[in-house]
UniProtKB/Swiss-Prot annotation:
It is found in: Nucleus. GO terms for biological process: positive regulation of flower development; regulatory ncRNA-mediated gene silencing. Residues 175-191 have a biased composition (Polar residues). One of its GO terms (cellular component) is nucleus. Under epigenetic control. In wild-type plant, FWA is silenced in the sporophyte. The epi-allele fwa mutants (which do not have a change in the nucleotide sequence of FWA) cause a late-flowering phenotype due to ectopic FWA expression in sporophytic tissues. Repression of FWA is dependent on histone H3 'Lys-4' methylation and cytosine methylation which are partly controlled by the lysine-specific demthylase 1 (LSD1) homologs, LDL1 and LDL2. Residues 206-439 form the START domain. Residues 38-98 bind DNA. The gene is HDG6. Residues 1-24, 173-202 are annotated as: Disordered. It comes from Arabidopsis thaliana (Mouse-ear cress). This is Homeobox-leucine zipper protein HDG6.
C-alpha cells in the first residue's frame, strides 16, 4: 500500500520481527454512523506484540491506572489515551468473565457432589442400615423408640417441675428465667439480669441460690466445650490482628451465647492453649477442686485463694457434679500490674469415661457491680482427656473482662493478648509443676547431686520453693501478706517500694525488710536475656554479690528438664558465700530467683534437717515477652521483652524503728545500676 508497507490501525509501521495484527481491539466508535442494520460502525485497532506485552506488564502491577498513567503509557507505546483506556476495560472484563466461569464450574462440581451424597444418604435411609454395624434394622421398632424417648422426656419434665416447686416459688416461669440468665453474660444490664449473689455473707446457701448457680455452671460448661472445639469460629489464627478483628469476632461470640454488651472501659481477653500434661485425668481434677492444692500448683499466678462455699461435693464417689464458690487473686510478677481479684463458681463434670471438664464463671451479669479491682471471669477452664498412659491431653481456655485503665501501658499489650494471664501461661505452669513432681518422684535425688542425701535434696527443693514464693510476694503483695506500700519522693516512675516489719517470725529475719521492684522494656528476646542472667560465666557482669569474681555450682537439682527448671547451690569463689538459686525458662516466661544463705544453716539442710528455720531475703528477675508484633506467639525469637527486677534488703534490725529515706535512695541507685550493667553487657540502647 502506497509503497510504505502495511500500516497498523494507528498508522504505525510494525517493528522488525513483529507480526502484523498480533492482537486486535474491537471497540465501538461512538461517533460513527449507523449501518444498515441499525448497529454502530465498529473500528478495529491492531496492536503489536511489543505493545501488548507492555500493557500486560503494566496490568499485572496496576489493573486500574490513573488518567495520567494512561496518557504516559499511550505516549510511550504510540497509542491513543482512549485505546489504552479501552484495553484496560476489556482486560478487566475478560478477567472477570474467566473468574466467573471458573467459579461456576467449581460450584457446579460441588453441587453435583452434594447431589450424589444426598442420593447415597437417601438410599441408605431406604435400606434402613445401621451406620455403625452396617446391618439391616427393623423399621417397625423406630416408632416404638420415638414413643419411648418422648415418655422419658415427659418424666424428666415432671421431675424438673417437682424440683422447682420444692425450691422455687414459680416453677416453670422461674426455670425459664434462670435458663435465660445462665450464660456467662446475658441480655442488657439491668434487664432480666442475674442478681449479684452475695459471697460475703456467711457460708449457708439457699436451695434457690444453688439452683441459680447450677444453671449458670451448666451453661458455662456448654460454652466452654464449644470454644474448645478444633473448628470453633470464634478464635483468631493470629493475635496480631486483634485490634482489627476482635470486635467483629466478639460480636459473633456474644450473639451466639447471648452475652451482655461490654460496659464502657471494659476489655475482653480470650486465649486458648492445648498440650500434654504428665498427670492422670482423675488426679488433675482432684487438684483443681482442692483450693489448697490449686494454689500450690499455680503459685506463680495464684498467690491466694479460698473456697467460700461448697455447694456440691459430686456424686458416685467422684468429683463429677462438684460445685464450689471460690475467691482468688491472680498476679503478673510486676509492680506495674495490679492484682486481679476474681470471684467465681467452679463446676466439674465427667462428660464420658476419661473426659472431664472443669469450668469457672463469675455469677454476675454486670461487672460494674463487682467490688473495686475485681474482674469478671467469663467461662474459663479445662477440657481434660485421659490418655490412659499417665498423661492427659488438656485444652485450656481463659476469658476475662476487666478495666484496662488500671494497668501500665507497658503491660497492656501483654495482658490484652492473653499472655500475662492467658491460657498458655496457665498450661505451661501446670506442665512444669507436673514434670517436676514426676522427676522428683521417679529419680534418685542422690544421683542428681552426689554427696547429698535424699532427705537433704527434698529439703533444698522445699527451701527453694519458699524462696520463690517470697520473691513473688515481695513484688505483688497479696492481700494476706504484711507488706505495706510506701510513697517515696523523687524516684523512678516504674519503681515500687514496700516494707515489712518482722518480729520473731519463723524463717524470717527480725527487723525492717525493704522490698524494691521495677519493670523495664529491653530490646532483646526472652531467651537471650535469660541465658545471660542465668549463666554463671556472666554473673560478675551484673551481680553485686560476686564482687567482680566468679561463682561455681556445688549442688544441682534438675526439677523439670523440658522447662529448664533447675535448683542450684552456688558458691562465690573469693569469699565462700553460698547462694540458693532457682531458674526456669518456658512458654510462661523465664525466672531467675536467688538468695544468700547462711553456711551453717544450709549444711544442716543438706544433711536432711528441717529447712523451715533457714532465713533469707530473695532477689531475682522475671522475664516475659512484650506482647508486641506477635513475638510471644512465634516463640519470642525476635522482638523485645519486659524485665522485672525485685530486691529485698534488711534495712534495720529494730522492727519499731523508722525507715530512713536515704536507705531507700541507695536501694534505688543499686537497682538502676544493675539494670544499666545488664544493658551495657548486652550492648543494648539505653
Amino acid at each position: 500500500m502506497n509503497g510504505q508497507g502495511d500500516l497498523d490501525a494507528v498508522g504505525n509501521i510494525p517493528k522488525p520481527g513483529e507480526a502484523e495484527g498480533d492482537e486486535i481491539d474491537m471497540i465501538n466508535d461512538m461517533s460513527g454512523v449507523n449501518d444498515q442494520d441499525g448497529g454502530r460502525m465498529r473500528r478495529t485497532h491492531r496492536r503489536t506484540a511489543y505493545q501488548t506485552q507492555e500493557l500486560e506488564n503494566f496490568y499485572m502491577e496496576n489493573p486500574h491506572p490513573t488518567e495520567e498513567q494512561r496518557y504516559e503509557l499511550g505516549q510511550r507505546l504510540n497509542m491513543g489515551v482512549n485505546q489504552v483506556k479501552n484495553w484496560f476495560q476489556n482486560k478487566r472484563n475478560l478477567e472477570k468473565i474467566n473468574n466467573d466461569h471458573l467459579e461456576n464450574v467449581t460450584l457446579r462440581e460441588e453441587h453435583d457432589r452434594l447431589l450424589a451424597t444426598q442420593d447415597q444418604l437417601r438410599s441408605a435411609m431406604l435400606r434402613s442400615l445401621c451406620n455403625i454395624c452396617g446391618k439391616a434394622t427393623n423399621c417397625g421398632d423406630t416408632e416404638y423408640e420415638v414413643q419411648k424417648l418422648m415418655a422419658e422426656n415427659a418424666n424428666l419434665e415432671r421431675e424438673i417441675d417437682q424440683f422447682n416447686s420444692r425450691y422455687l416459688s414459680h416453677p416453670k416461669q422461674r426455670m425459664v428465667s434462670t435458663s435465660e440468665q445462665a450464660p456467662s453474660s446475658s441480655s442488657n444490664p439491668g434487664i432480666n439480669a442475674t442478681p449479684v449473689l452475695d459471697f460475703s455473707g456467711g457460708t449457708r446457701t439457699s436451695e434457690k441460690e444453688t439452683s441459680i448457680f447450677l444453671n449458670l455452671a451448666i451453661t458455662a460448661l456448654r460454652e466452654l466445650i464449644t470454644l474448645g472445639e478444633v473448628d470453633c469460629p470464634f478464635w483468631m489464627i493470629d493475635p496480631i490482628v486483634r485490634s482489627k478483628g476482635v470486635s467483629k469476632i466478639y460480636e459473633k461470640y456474644r450473639s451466639s451465647f447471648n452475652n451482655v454488651t461490654k460496659p464502657p472501659g471494659q476489655i475482653v481477653e480470650a486465649s486458648r492453649a492445648k498440650g500434654l500434661v504428665p498427670m492422670t485425668c482423675v488426679t488433675l481434677v482432684k487438684t483443681l477442686m482442692d483450693t489448697g492444692k490449686w494454689v500450690n500448683v499455680f503459685a506463680p499466678i495464684v498467690p491466694v485463694a479460698s473456697t467460700h462455699k461448697v455447694l456440691s461435693t459430686g456424686s458416685g464417689g467422684t468429683k463429677s457434679g462438684s460445685l464450689q464458690q471460690i475467691q482468688a487473686e491472680f498476679q503478673v510478677i510486676s509492680p506495674l500490674v495490679p492484682k486481679r481479684k476474681v470471684t467465681f463458681i467452679r463446676y466439674c463434670k465427667e462428660i464420658r469415661q476419661g473426659l472431664w471438664v472443669v469450668v469457672d464463671v463469675t455469677p454476675t451479669q454486670n461487672p460494674t457491680l463487682l467490688p473495686y479491682g475485681c474482674s469478671k471471669r467469663l467461662p474459663s477452664g479445662l477440657i481434660i482427656d485421659d490418655l490412659s498412659n499417665g498423661y492427659s491431653q488438656v485444652t485450656w481456655i481463659e476469658q476475662a473482662e476487666y478495666n484496662e485503665s488500671h494497668i501500665h501501658q507497658l503491660y497492656q499489650p501483654l495482658i490484652g493478648y492473653g499472655i500475662g494471664l492467658g491460657a498458655k501461661r496457665w498450661l505451661a505452669t501446670l506442665q512444669r509443676h507436673c514434670e517436676s513432681l514426676s522427676t522428683l518422684s521417679s529419680t534418685n535425688l542422690t544421683e542428681i547431686s552426689p554427696g547429698l542425701s535424699a532427705k537433704g535434696a527434698t529439703e533444698i527443693v522445699k527451701l527453694a520453693q519458699r524462696m520463690t514464693l517470697n520473691y513473688y510476694r515481695g513484688i505483688t503483695s497479696p492481700s494476706v501478706d504484711k507488706w505495706q506500700k510506701i510513697q517515696v519522693e523523687n524516684v523512678a516512675q516504674n519503681m515500687s517500694f514496700m516494707i515489712r516489719k518482722n518480729v520473731n517470725e519463723p524463717g524470717e529475719l527480725t527487723g525492717i525488710v525493704l522490698s524494691a521492684s521495677t519493670s523495664v522494656w529491653l530490646p532483646v528476646n526472652q531467651h537471650t536475656l535469660f541465658a545471660f542472667i542465668s549463666h554463671l560465666s556472666f554473673r560478675h557482669e551484673w551481680d553485686i554479690l560476686t564482687n567482680d569474681t566468679t561463682m561455681e555450682e556445688t549442688i544441682r537439682i534438675q526439677k523439670a528438664k523440658r522447662h529448664g527448671n533447675i535448683i542450684s547451690l552456688l558458691k562465690i569463689v573469693n569469699n565462700g558465700m553460698l547462694v540458693l538459686q532457682e531458674i526456669w525458662n518456658d512458654a510462661s516466661g523465664a525466672m531467675v530467683v536467688y538468695a544468700p544463705v547462711e553456711t551453717n544453716s544450709i549444711e544442716l539442710v543438706k544433711r536432711g534437717e528441717n529447712s523451715d528455720s533457714v532465713k533469707f531475703l530473695p532477689s531475682g528477675f522475671s522475664i516475659v515477652p512484650d506482647g508486641v508484633n506477635g513475638s510471644y506467639h512465634r516463640g519470642n525469637t525476635g522482638g523485645g521483652c519486659l524485665l522485672t527486677f525485685g530486691l529485698q534488703i534488711l534495712v534495720g534490725i529494730n522492727p519499731t524503728a523508722a525507715l530512713i529515706q536515704g536507705t531507700v535512695k541507695s536501694v534505688e541507685t543499686l537497682m538502676a545500676h544493675t539494670i544499666v550493667k545488664i544493658k551495657s553487657a548486652l550492648d543494648l540502647q539505653t
